[in-house]
Regions:
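Domain-level signal for soluble alpha/beta catalytic cores
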Residues: 1-157, 164-211
Length: 211
């Protein structure tokens, strides 16, 4: 599964399009990602504290109507907005993804995913990046137990060891790769933001690293 991440309010053009409910820039970026091989699209509307529910519904309906019910990851800290997006989501091509939970203040997003038969990206942290793989696995186990106690299948929890910036944290990269192997050995799914690796690198280098 490849999740396209370029529909994010961190990009000024996308933020403007979401704010103005302008479909064209959203559709254009979505098509570019799907043409490049994305199988899911991440819809990051930011905190969206004022109009998040309406905005997420609008974005979900726009993208799924334009691209044959493309599966989506709903990405916001606003839980009500995620629930609103799920309420209009068509599952024919795949379950919605809740992006994301962690083992700290955001662990309730696992509850949200369980209640809505959704996949949940589970960040192996508790607000801060884990210091080592022992800590990552502790967080992983806590979230796995939480999800399964609520009736989730283990396959619907996608564990993210948190990819780190190569430019300043090269010594930590092997730990992240080892964590992915540990997840696999446990029969668990993993995911990660590959573009985090290239953050801060020269623009001509980033596409090579991200690929």
């Amino acid at each position: 599964v490849t999740i396209g991440e370029r529909l994010s309010t961190t990009a000024p053009a996308v933020n403007k399009a979401f704010t103005e409910r302008d479909p064209e820039p959203i559709i254009k970026r979505a098509k570019q990602q799907l043409d490049a091989g994305a199988t899911y699209l991440d819809v990051n509307i930011g905190p969206a504290e004022n109009d998040g529910e309406d905005l997420m519904k609008w974005a979900v309906q726009l993208l799924q109507s334009e691209f044959d019910n493309v599966p989506l990851a709903l990405d916001t800290t606003n839980q009500k907005a995620i629930e609103a997006g799920i309420s209009v989501y068509n599952r024919s091509k795949g379950k919605p993804i809740v992006n994301s939970a962690d083992a700290g203040d955001r662990i309730s997003n696992i509850d949200l995913a369980a209640a809505n038969d959704a996949i949940c990206i589970a960040l192996c942290s508790s607000g801060m990046v884990a210091s080592d793989n022992d800590e990552r696995m502790m967080h992983c186990q806590n979230m796995l137990e939480r999800g399964m106690s609520l009736g989730m299948e283990a396959e619907d929890l996608w564990f993210d060891p948190l990819f780190l910036v190569v430019k300043g944290m090269q010594d930590k990269q092997m730990e992240v790769l080892e964590a992915i192997k540990m997840f696999s050995d446990m029969g668990l799914n993993s995911t990660g933001g590959l573009s985090n690796n290239s953050n801060g690198m020269p623009k001509h280098i980033r596409p090579i690293m991200d690929s």
